Amino acid sequence: MVLSIGENVTTSFEFAKDGLVGYWTRWLILFVAGCIPIVNFITFGYLVKIYRGVDVAPELEGYLEMFIDGLKLLIIEIVYIIVPLMLIVASTAFMETETVVETIDVSGMTITTGATIMPASEPTGVGLALILIGALLAVIFSLVATIAGIRFAKTGEFGEGFNFGAIFETINEIGWGHYILASIVFIIVVCIIAVVLSLIPYIGELLVMIIVPLLILWQGKFFENLYSCA
């Protein structure tokens, strides 16, 4: 069944809500695990379970398997972001520089005490181009990485996360325009919720942190639905 973007947002949210509300231990474990480096691989592993395609939120079991799957998913995500990240980092080599001369005045005589090369506030044309290209590629590669992660989850094969032919075929079936629009809509909805919660005095930021497990389930099911409807 093909879902509209609105239907996907709604049904995936219901999936997340039904999977956590009333299952407070599951919510707590995902929250705590997500806050601890390395242990948070378990959270990524739980996302892999959702990516495999389930009608209800899966049980939190098989922690070692989730840890390993989470590590594999994270590696896939990192590999895809390396290229745009390298371009953005390379742009710093093309930052304009200026020399700051340090002087002191002694009895009417100006004495130079040293000079320091400082980066200017704006990059050169080449640097700016690399930043823009890197940012654009980061967006594109993040879209590809999501489908790659889901493909890995569904096949159980790490190498399938780099099966570019199959990955791009899936994205073409989804439709690049639809995929990008759906991603933008989802991000906007999540940002609105996060901003509204953060504005609550005293407890706003804490509430945003608490709903992170809900957001993980929500986005996992949202993008799995896109994949499955292709």
Show which residues each predicted segment covers.
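Interfacial aromatic "cap" segments that immediately flank transmembrane helices
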Residues: 3-34, 60-86, 143-194, 221, ...
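Membrane-helix interface segments in multi-pass membrane proteins
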Residues: 1-2, 10, 84-142, 190-216
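Selective recognition of hydrophobic, aromatic-rich stretches within alpha-helical transmembrane segments
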Residues: 31-52, 121-161, 195-230
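Selected alpha-helical membrane-embedding segments in polytopic membrane proteins
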Residues: 39-98, 105, 113-127
